[in-house]
Regions:
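Cyclic nucleotide-binding regulatory module and flanking cytosolic helices
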Residues: 62-110, 187-224
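Regulatory nucleotide-sensing modules
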Residues: 82-139, 259
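Short strand-loop-strand
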Residues: 121, 129-131, 232-275, 279, ...
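Cyclic-nucleotide recognition modules
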Residues: 145-199, 304
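Short beta-strand-centered aromatic/proline hotspots
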Residues: 246-247, 293-299
Length: 330
């Protein structure tokens, strides 16, 4: 960098001595060196200086723009561009550069809230690694809408509007994100308007939160629930060495089971999206039925005295014959 600084001073010396041609040549070489060193801001400011010194040095002005652009493309994280190839394939090289260098990077730890339902969120989040849970709160009820992973984004429902978030997002594991701020969107509207349109078109192709909510309600209505009593052993599969919890069964269907569990609100919210194993045995005078199923927690509903009504969706539907036998124990 010290050598760069001395060369910049030499440019000014050339100008004072009316050696414009030498100043342009040296400035062009400096732009190339800064771009190669990935100091893109400095390279761009020197290119502006080049234009000020000699606006007729068109060859150097055009070539320096290409040098910076190519260096920026080469410096883009290949893992990110591969993860988001389905987005970048719709963009020009200039738009790809504007998008990539217009984003910020962030890391969220497990159970850290990314944005909260009912609050303003001026960001769009692109997931590069990890899992994000999207859930909806109504009164004391929490419903898992979706679990998102690399190559998926979240926050699109409010990014292009001035409305509050209709759902909450929380890191389900350590999550690496790229964040687009609305200030970048406003800048692109003047500098890269097609990028804004393409990004909005891309987001409009995603399933809206209201549709996810309707789908959850339809799933709930499709398979009738049957009351069931007794206790079950629950083990959270996402946690290594997780202990077994004893819970009180409430109801069961082909697609899932519900039970009552005591815990804090924070712990309850963190369970959304977790995989579990559920074991229980129902006994009558001359028969018994054992169930050993794995599923995913899709709903958490607050009751009194730190009790929570937990909804689980089976990974594999319950056998019809087994359910018919369970119903006789009701």
């Amino acid at each position: 960098m010290e050598d760069f600084s001395s060369q910049e001073k030499l440019v000014e010396t050339y100008l004072k001595e009316n050696k414009k041609e030498q100043a342009v040549e040296l400035l062009f070489n400096l732009i190339d060196q800064y771009a190669e060193a990935r100091h893109f801001g400095k390279a761009e400011s020197l290119r502006e200086r080049l234009f000020e010194i000699d606006s007729m040095a068109l060859d150097e002005i055009v070539k320096s723009a290409d040098i910076i652009e190519n260096a920026k493309m080469s410096a883009m994280d290949p893992a990110h561009t591969e993860t988001w190839s389905h987005l970048y394939q719709h963009l020009t090289q200039e738009e790809s550069i504007a998008l990539y260098y217009g984003m910020q990077s962030a890391v969220y730890e497990p159970e850290q809230i990314i944005f909260q339902q009912g609050e303003m969120n001026p960001h769009l989040y692109l997931i590069n690694a990890g899992r994000v849970k999207l859930f909806y709160h109504k009164d004391q009820h929490a419903i898992l809408l979706n679990t998102l992973g690399p190559g998926e984004l979240v926050g699109e429902d409010t990014f292009f509007t001035n409305s509050t978030c209709t759902a909450s997002a929380m890191a389900d594991s350590k999550v690496k994100l790229n964040i687009i701020e609305k200030s970048a969107l406003h800048k692109w509207q003047s500098d890269e308007p097609n990028l804004v349109n393409k990004l909005q078109d891309y987001c409009s192709g995603l399933e809206p939160i209201k549709d996810l909510l309707q789908k959850k309600e339809l799933e709930r209505r499709t398979h009738p629930r049957h009351n069931i009593s007794g206790s079950a052993a629950i083990k959270i599969l996402d946690n290594k060495g997780s202990k077994v919890y004893k819970v009180d069964l409430s109801d069961i269907s082909i697609s899932g089971v519900s039970f009552i569990m005591n815990m804090s609100k924070t712990a309850a919210d963190s369970l959304l999206g977790c995989r579990l194993n559920c074991k229980f045995t129902l006994r009558a005078a001359f028969s018994e039925i054992s169930v050993d199923q794995e599923g995913c927690i899709v709903g958490v509903h607050g009751q009194l005295f730190n009790e929570y009504y937990i909804n689980v969706k089976w990974e594999e539907p319950l056998d019809d014959g087994l359910l018919d036998r369970i119903k006789t124990f009701g």
